[in-house]
């Protein structure tokens, strides 16, 4: 009986967390649909328990809720660890994640591509990325 209660509580917590991150999950679903149309080979990297990691052909990575879309490159494992920090941010911020982290991060990345002078600064010093790194160092093994 006690085990059943623990299981029910776990499912309720997961449901609340899913709803808390609902905006990110909706955008992730749309982005996944786009990737299905654009990429031939999509799969799930099952080595990670903290999130659903979807490797694909792309530059960089994008984290939306519990979904990490990551480009396959030589820095893959390091990138995934960093992106798992973003999943923690999503759990903390919930519906504010896209405003506080997502939009500023993508904007900063785009500005760095448009203005080479910004590339002189370390990308991971930007507040969204620094916080993700700090969280991943603290909580992801």
Per-segment meaning from a language model:
Residues 49-74:
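Active-site scaffold of zinc-dependent metalloenzymes
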Residues 84-102:
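Catalytic Zn2+-binding segment of zinc metalloproteases
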Residues 2-44, 56-59, 98-141:
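Metalloprotease/metallohydrolase-associated module, dominated by Zn2+-dependent proteases
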Residues 34, 50-52, 82:
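Short amphipathic alpha-helical surface micro-motifs
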Residues 75-87:
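Short alpha-helical catalytic segment bearing the HExxH-like zincin motif
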Residues 10, 75-76, 92-96:
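Membrane-helix interface segments
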